[in-house]
Regions:
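Residues within the helices of the helix-turn-helix
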Residues: 7, 18, 47
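Short alpha-helical DNA-recognition segment
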Residues: 14-33
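The DNA-recognition helices of helix-turn-helix-type DNA-binding domains
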Residues: 27, 38, 67
């Protein structure tokens, strides 16, 4: 996952992390764990993030999925 790209999209939408978490229905502590790599976003969370940030399919793939298949 590209944490910096996701953070950039949040900023582009004029949101604080707290406001974003509220809009996406994710607790701040859960968001922090996922951003640090301790756990992964679920499909449902990714769907809510896509909606909250109005992400295109390309942007979604760029943020959440690896460039290479291993």
């Amino acid at each position: 996952m590209k944490q910096n790209v996701l953070r950039g999209k949040i900023v582009e939408h004029g949101m604080t992390i707290g406001k974003f978490c509220e809009c996406a229905g994710i607790s701040r502590s859960s968001f922090d764990r996922k951003m640090s790599g301790s756990s992964e976003f679920t499909r449902d969370e990714i769907s809510r993030i896509v909606t909250a940030l109005n992400l295109s399919a390309e942007e979604t793939c760029n943020i959440f999925f690896a460039d290479e298949v291993t």
